[in-house]
C-alpha cells in the first residue's frame, strides 16, 4: 500500500517534526480536556504522596497524542522516560532487561502494547502489580527461578486496538483514557502554535482551512502545515492564508472533508458499481485493488465516522451525504 499524505500513522518525516512541536507540560497540551484534567489530579496526588503514578493506558486512533502524553507525564513527575514498542520486545529476557534498568519513579512507555507476545506480557503482570520479576536461570533439572525486586515505576501503554488487549493486562492499569478526535477549533489552536514554532506566518482563515481538512488528528494537521508552508513559500509570499491553504491542499488532493483520492474512489465505486450498496467489504476491496483488511482498518473508519458510509447487517451502504460530496445524483433507498 502506497503511503498517503493523510495517513494518521507515523511517517518517517513526522518524527523530527513531532519532536520539535511536542508540548512538554500539561498546561501546553491542547485538547483531550477530560484526560488532561484527570491526569493533572492524579499526578499532583502522586507527587504529594511521593509515590509513582499508577500505570496508565491510552487507547484510540493513531496520531492523537498518546506518545506526547507519556512524555508529559514523565516531565510533570520529574522522572526519566524510557520508550519502546510491543513488536520490539521479542523475548521475556528483553523485557526483563528493560525493567531492570529502570530507576525509581521512571516512566516506561510501551507503544503498540497490544502486540506484546504472551510470554513477555505475563512477565509484566508481577512487575506491574508487585514490582518484581521472576527469572528462570538454566535449563531442565538444573533450572531455578530467581526473583528480582524492581524500583517502583509507571507503565504507560498505548494502543490503537484496545479490543486486542487481554483482560489480565488491561485490568492492571489504574488509569485508562480513550483519546478522542480533535475539534476544528482545537486543531486550529494546534496549527497556530506549530506555525509559531516553525516561524511560519499564518492567518486565522488559513489555520481554519487547514484544521477542517486534518481529519481531527494533530499529527496530520502538523504534516499538512509543513507541506502548505512549502507552497506558501514558493508560489506565494510565504504567508499562509485561506487561499494558499485551499490551493495547496487541492493540489495535494485533500478535499474539504479531509478525504483523499482513495477515500473518494471507495465512495464512487460503491455508488457506480454497486448502486450505493449494500455491498460486502471483500467486493469493495477487490474492485479498488486493495485487500479487505486494509479497507476495513485504514479507510473505512473515517468514512463511517463522518457519516459517509453505514454498516448494516447486509453490508456497507453509502449515505446521501456521500452522494452529495461526490457530486452524484442520489436516489432514496430504504436501508435494511
From Swiss-Prot:
Protein name as annotated: Holliday junction branch migration complex subunit RuvB
Residues that bind DNA: 311, 316
An example Gene Ontology molecular-function term: four-way junction helicase activity
Pfam families with a match to the protein in the record: AAA_lid_4 (PF17864), RuvB_C (PF05491), RuvB_N (PF05496)
Known catalytic reactions: ATP + H2O = ADP + phosphate + H(+)
Name of the coding gene: ruvB
Binding site for ATP: 21-22, 63, 66-68, 129-131, 172, 182, 219
Keyword annotations: ATP-binding, Cytoplasm, DNA damage, DNA recombination, DNA repair, DNA-binding, Hydrolase, Nucleotide-binding
Listed EC numbers: 3.6.4.-
Region Head domain (RuvB-H), residue ranges: 256-336
Amino acids binding Mg(2+): 67
InterPro entries the UniProt entry points to: AAA+_ATPase (IPR003593), AAA_lid_4 (IPR041445), DNA_helicase_Holl-junc_RuvB (IPR004605), P-loop_NTPase (IPR027417), RuvB-like_N (IPR008824), RuvB_C (IPR008823), WH-like_DNA-bd_sf (IPR036388), WH_DNA-bd_sf (IPR036390)
Gene Ontology CC annotations of this record: cytoplasm; Holliday junction resolvase complex
Amino acid at each position: 500500500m502506497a503511503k498517503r499524505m493523510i495517513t494518521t500513522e507515523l511517517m518517517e518525516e513526522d518524527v523530527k517534526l513531532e519532536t520539535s512541536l511536542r508540548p512538554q507540560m500539561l498546561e501546553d497540551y491542547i485538547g483531550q480536556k477530560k484526560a488532561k484534567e484527570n491526569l493533572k489530579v492524579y499526578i499532583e496526588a502522586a507527587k504529594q504522596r511521593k509515590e509513582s503514578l499508577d500505570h496508565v493506558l491510552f487507547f484510540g486512533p493513531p496520531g492523537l497524542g498518546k506518545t506526547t502524553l507519556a512524555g508529559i507525564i514523565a516531565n510533570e513527575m520529574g522522572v526519566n522516560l524510557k520508550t519502546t514498542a510491543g513488536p520490539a520486545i521479542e523475548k521475556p529476557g528483553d523485557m526483563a532487561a528493560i525493567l531492570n534498568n529502570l530507576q525509581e519513579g521512571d516512566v516506561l512507555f510501551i507503544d503498540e502494547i497490544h502486540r506484546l507476545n504472551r510470554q513477555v506480557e505475563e512477565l509484566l503482570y508481577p512487575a506491574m502489580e508487585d514490582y518484581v520479576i521472576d527469572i528462570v536461570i538454566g535449563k531442565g533439572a538444573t533450572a531455578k527461578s530467581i526473583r528480582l525486586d524492581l524500583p517502583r515505576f509507571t507503565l504507560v501503554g498505548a494502543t490503537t486496538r484496545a479490543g486486542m488487549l487481554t483482560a489480565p493486562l488491561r485490568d492492571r492499569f489504574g488509569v485508562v483514557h480513550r483519546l478522542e478526535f480533535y475539534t476544528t477549533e482545537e486543531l486550529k489552536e494546534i496549527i497556530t502554535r506549530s506555525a509559531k514554532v516553525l516561524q511560519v506566518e499564518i492567518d486565522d482563515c488559513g489555520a481554519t482551512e487547514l484544521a477542517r481538512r486534518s481529519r481531527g488528528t494533530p499529527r496530520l494537521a502538523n504534516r499538512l502545515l509543513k507541506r502548505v508552508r512549502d507552497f506558501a513559500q514558493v508560489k506565494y509570499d510565504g504567508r499562509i492564508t485561506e487561499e494558499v491553504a485551499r490551493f495547496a491542499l487541492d493540489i495535494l488532493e485533500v478535499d474539504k472533508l479531509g478525504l483523499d483520492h482513495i477515500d473518494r474512489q471507495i465512495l464512487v465505486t460503491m455508488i457506480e458499481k454497486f448502486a450505493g450498496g449494500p455491498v460486502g467489504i471483500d467486493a469493495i476491496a477487490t474492485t479498488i485493488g486493495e485487500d479487505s483488511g486494509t479497507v476495513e482498518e485504514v479507510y473505512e473508519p473515517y468514512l463511517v465516522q463522518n457519516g459517509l458510509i453505514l454498516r448494516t447487517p447486509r453490508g456497507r451502504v453509502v449515505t446521501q451525504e456521500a452522494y452529495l460530496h461526490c457530486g452524484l445524483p442520489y436516489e432514496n433507498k430504504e436501508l435494511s
